[in-house]
Amino acid sequence: MTQIFHSMIAAILGISEKQIGQTLSLLDDGATIPFISRYRKEMTGGLDEVQIESIRTHYEKLKETAKRKETIVATIREQGKMTPELQKRIDDTWDSTALEDIYLPYKPKRKTRAEAARQKGLEPLATLLMLQREPHPEQRAAAFVKGDVKDADDALKGARDIIAEQVSENERARNMLRNTFARQALLTAKVIKGKEEEGAKYRDYFDCSEPLKRCSSHRLLAIRRAEAEGLLKVSISLNDEECVERLERQFVQSNNACGKQVAEAVQDAYKRLLKPSIETEFAAQSKERADDEAIRVFAENLRQLLLASPLGQKRVMGIDPGFRTGCKVVCLDAQGNLLHNENIYPHPPVNQSKEAFAKLQKMIEAYKVEAIAVGNGTASRETEDFLKRQTFNREVQIFIVSEQGASIYSASKIARDEFPEYDVTVRGAVSIARRLMDPLAELVKIDPKSIGVGQYQHDVDQTKLKKSLDQTVENCVNLVGVNLNTASSHLLTYISGLGPQLAQNIVNYRAENGAFASRKELMKVPRMGAKAFEQCAGFLRIPNAGNPLDNTAVHPESYHIVEQMAKDLGCSVAELIADKELRRKIQPERYLSPTVGMPTLKDILQELEKPGRDPRGPIKVFEFDKNVRTIDDLRIGMELPGIVGNITNFGAFVDIGIKENGLIHLSQLAQKYVSNPNEIVSIHQQVRVKVLSVDTERKRIQLTMIGVSG
């Protein structure tokens, strides 16, 4: 069975069976996706995280189908209806829909009209009608009038119920109807009378009809949400007459009285059984496709957000701005530890701008502040302006930082554990400052669904969503790597091979014994076994370690290779890392072995070139247009700087410094055809846009990147 799975997955993904087998073997052995992708390239043929995840997903689906087959076979055997031909059909079928069609006639049912008719002894009459040879079925039906069967008409009705069920369970009929649905089904939405005002935000769908196959995921999810809120009536429709006609061509063989009885049964089968069944099936399938697309978009947005450029280890002031309640100010050291907090009131109604400046000046001097992070919520622009009007004694850079999810973090157990003696306002300001220093380390503390980059995230399959987002966070954390001596337990949790318990054990060990001096010391951590060490070691960094390789992505299992390279060149490992000319003399082919191939050697050489390199780019200072404060300040044709805040499959939302974000539709991202917005823009990218239209009533702003100067 395993080999069959390998062949099927290989055919679906276009990856060799050997790669599939090796990858699944590693996964079964407990290896994580980041570990396999980074350190087992020879075994997988260089597959990336997405390919490995896809292999795992397909394998799990096939195992589920195999388990379902076992249940189906057991049920049919219990009924004594299994035949060699039926067994072969089940064995050969791996499509879940086709499998359920095979099983349908044997599936135990609640008491249906057909089952009730069978219990009245009407199945022989149904068989007689289906033969369509009897010229006077009413006369033959009279023989079945007994017990609960009142008269011949009642007998014929029961027989038609049996035929209707047989028609609805016929594989050919179901497939015909599926094909018709796939080609012709229309998704129709209409506003429920009296709900026009309440459902104003769904105005685009008040009277819409479009082919289901062309309905984009975001439109489908929006329509389904409006339906769930009781604002729209939604249906899937198609040409009923054509469908019934095609069914009659299949089942009605004679133009006689029996044929008319069968035709009546076919019409009933379509209306009462087949159409609702296939409609439900298509609704579920289209919802699943929309969910998968929305989850894919969310995961990609999250990946980009987590990999946003960090300011790094600098002394930062964080400001959570506000008007009446003032601005909460915190000062952090280069490691993100809280040194000081207080409030300032530079804005109305208090207007203590002079006092606010004096306090800021004092804090900047006292804590040697190098940068200021301002939250992008209420009073953000006013606070930014206030800061830029001041002349401080030290040079400080000012950054606007997304507050999305900061309030969730500030009230969370993680925040309470970190700052038990401070209130939520202090914790929120600390989170804003830390997001500037290292977005990844801070954002992993927040449920990704609270970060605000999802598309209809509450409407999609929550189990699938969580699995995808957790894997995305894990991939990002391991791509960057973490400092073993400063990482929080929450960040360590996402490191390959660790999890919550080992992560906490590492933090506890650090607290009791001081900083780790080497990766080897990890083996002293309670419950750290050889397997966990193998999986995690390469992703944990120790700056200033005795062995410089402990601060690189070179895995300890490969240290001997680097040591041999250094020995062959007559130098130390540290000298090899420091001297470009020495590295140029390395001949990688000399270090090939049955277990170490060129992919691993190339990775090692890249690490020696830039030890512990951070894949995230340098951070850039950004300024919004000073003349734009509200949506009323916008004019068509106006060009503005902006920051991409969210990406969907229909375009990108851009923060232009006001309360409302503007949308760059897919068609307005570039002169060329764009199928995926991520080809053009990414989360946090700084862009220049032009205003196309402004709808102040609905708070909608349309933007373009086409024909923009500079």
Task: Give the positions of each predicted feature.
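A glycine-rich phosphate-binding loop feature that marks nucleotide/adenosyl-phosphate handling sites
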Residues: 179-187, 319-323, 377-382, 401-408, ...
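Short, ordered loop/turn segments at secondary-structure junctions
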Residues: 39-41, 130, 239, 321, ...
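C-terminal accessory/binding modules appended to enzymatic or scaffolding proteins
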Residues: 14-15, 309-311, 474-508, 626-670
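Long, charge-rich intrinsically disordered scaffolds of nucleic-acid metabolism proteins
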Residues: 98, 399, 405, 410-480, ...
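Low-complexity, acidic/Ser/Thr- and charged residue-rich accessory regions of DNA metabolism proteins
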Residues: 144-146, 150-152, 208, 247-256, ...
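Accessory alpha-helical DNA-binding modules that contact the DNA backbone or grooves
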Residues: 32-33, 44, 48-113, 117-150, ...
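Duplex nucleic acid-engaging cores and interfaces of nucleic-acid transaction enzymes
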Residues: 51-54, 61, 65-318, 324-422, ...
